[in-house]
UniProtKB/Swiss-Prot annotation:
Organism: Streptococcus pyogenes serotype M1
Its biological purpose: Part of the ATP-binding cassette (ABC) transport system AdcABC involved in zinc import. Binds zinc with high affinity and specificity and delivers it to the membrane permease for translocation into the cytoplasm.
Pfam family, one: ZnuA
InterPro entries, A to Z: AdhesinB, Bact_metal-bind_prot9, Calycin, Lipoprotein_PsaA-like, ZinT_dom, ZnuA-like
The keyword Translocase is assigned to this record: no
UniProt record similarity statement: Belongs to the bacterial solute-binding protein 9 family.
Segments of this protein annotated with the region Disordered: 125-148
Gene: adcA
Name of the protein this chain belongs to: Zinc-binding protein AdcA
Signal sequence, start to end: 1-28
GO molecular function: zinc ion binding
């Protein structure tokens, strides 16, 4: 009897082992069903999946990805898929709601941008100029604003490589049995992207004209990565004839800078093109944002690479012709945030403007969380400083051992936390000081003085947060010392910086990078 039981147990073990092997084999041999959002995501995902899955695209050509809202049928497709791949929450803004509605936990959700930091969307950049070695308060980012981040990373071959790597890594983790194939497919696709990146670099690195004018500000990453300046204009669309007033101002702008082409996202109607040519003396050309290809175009052999090479060819209509530097129609850099204001606009502020719990950004600089920021800054400086030089510069500025500060506006107290040890003092407002920096911009220091005689190095403190009147701070630079307010006014190299304690390091890095 005992032998029969042992035999039965052995047979059962063999059966289950066989079933497990079969299940793994089915998973390895079966195809993964992947739903993607719009064309670049579809293209990149197919490049990774290869023959190991079926890839579907929700948005067809002609659909505006920015305005798309999924139907019940679309959500059902996502629900029934093995994986769902999208670009970024700033592009497909509806994805966060769809995630919440998914009842199936088997769907692997992949964000193409992964942990990439993005730049601010059009109209949200504060245009900081931070290549100077002196801290002029137009060098740092503001935290906590509801910025629209620019998601158009796929229009830069250089950044598209990272998107493909993110898709590869996420799908490989979800389907380890297919990881080897995914990695091999991705490697082949990435090689093609690297070749495209080389083509863009070769054509644009020595461009005779670095600026191009576009109606659709989608090419910021492409411009950044290849040393160009994207200048967007308002009041001109490919399908609506501009007003007489707009034509008049545009004509002056075009003549002032010798602009030959304005780039549109699609073919401008013949009427619009003729009006621009006749009245403003400028031609219309197409730079595709690659948000969709028709079935006909794909069957004809068009894909990401053919369209991107066509974009490069069209862009060279401008970049291959020498001309004066083209500036935006309006100077958006001279803002209060950047240090341009009138004395009468500066108002007194109370400690309550900085109430809350704050963390130093210095640890995030040390652990590499901010490294992407330095890379971006180096590219924005166009060779004036390297990423390593930026990191050194901010290391000096951010350095502090006061890791946390808690401010109670009602009690008018500040608690400084150093190595876990807390020191709390009560402060009174001591006025404001307007400082003028070498480039001509200015900043305001709001001064406070501790009541306690034993406050020591925390006797005098000064806040600077790019604001000049009462408002709730989103981040701040803090100066402190035990000698005098006047001595602190001279401190321009060292500015410990603090953000809300509820923010992650990546969230802080993203906000810094958006400016």
């Amino acid at each position: 009897m005992k032998k029969k039981i042992l035999l039965m147990m052995s047979l059962i073990s063999v059966f289950f082992a066989w079933q497990l092997t079969q299940a793994k084999q089915v998973l390895a041999e079966g195809k993964v069903k992947v739903v993607t959002t719009f064309y670049p995501v579809y293209e990149f995902t197919k490049g990774v999946i290869g023959n190991d899955g079926d890839v579907f695209m929700l948005m067809k050509a002609g659909t505006e990805p920015h305005d798309f809202e999924p139907s019940t049928k679309d959500i059902k497709k996502i629900q029934d898929a093995d994986a769902f791949v999208y670009m970024d929450d700033n592009m497909e803004t509806w994805v966060s709601d769809v995630k919440k509605s998914l009842t199936s936990k088997k769907v692997t959700i992949v964000k193409g941008t992964g942990n990439m930091l993005l730049v601010a969307g059009a109209g949200h950049d504060h245009h900081h100029e931070d290549a100077d070695k002196k801290h002029e308060h137009n060098k740092h980012s503001e935290e906590g604003h509801n910025h629209a981040f620019d998601p158009h990373v796929w229009l830069s071959p250089y950044r598209s490589i990272t998107v493909v790597e993110n898709i590869r890594d996420s799908l490989s983790k979800a389907y380890p049995e297919k990881a080897e194939n995914f990695k091999a497919n991705a490697a082949t696709y990435i090689e093609k992207l690297k070749e495209l990146d080389k083509d863009y670099t070769a054509a644009l690195s020595d461009a005779k004209q670095k600026s191009f004018v576009t109606q659709h500000a989608a090419f910021g990453y492409m411009a950044l990565d290849y040393g160009l300046n994207q200048i967007s204009i308002n009041g001109v669309t490919p399908d609506a004839e501009p007003s007489a007033k707009r034509i008049a101002t545009l004509s002056k702008y075009v003549k002032k800078y010798g602009i030959k082409y304005i780039y549109f996202e699609e073919n401008a109607s013949s009427k619009v093109a003729k009006t621009l040519a006749k009245e403003a003396g400028v031609k219309a050309a197409v730079l595709s944002p690659l948000e969709g290809l028709t079935e006909k175009e794909m069957k004809a052999g068009q894909d990401y690479f053919t369209v991107m090479r066509k974009n490069l060819e069209t862009l060279r209509l401008t970049t291959d012709v020498a001309g004066k530097e083209i500036l935006p129609e309006k100077d958006t850099t001279k803002t209060v945030y950047n240090g341009y204001f009138k004395d009468k606009e500066v108002k007194d502020r109370q400690l309550s403007d900085w109430s809350g719990s704050w963390q130093s950004v210095y640890p995030y600089l040390q652990d590499g969380t901010l490294d992407q920021v330095w890379d971006y800054k180096a590219k924005k400086s166009k060779g004036k400083m390297t990423a390593a030089e930026y990191k050194d510069y901010y290391t000096t500025g951010y350095k502090t051992d006061v890791e946390q500060i808690k401010i109670n506006g009602k009690k008018k107290t500040m608690t400084f936390v150093r190595n876990g040890e807390k020191k709390t003092f009560t402060y009174t407002y001591a006025g404001k000081e307007i400082l003028t920096y070498p480039k001509g911009n200015r900043g305001v220091r709001f001064m406070f003085e501790a009541k306690e005689a034993d406050a020591g190095e925390f006797k005098y403190v000064q806040f600077s947060d790019h604001a000049i009147a009462p408002e709730k701070a989103k981040h701040f630079h803090l100066y402190w010392g035990g000698d005098s307010q006047e001595k602190l006014h001279k401190e321009l190299e060292h500015w410990p910086t603090y953000y809300g304690s509820d923010l992650s390091g990546r969230e802080i890095a993203q906000e810094i990078n958006a400016h």
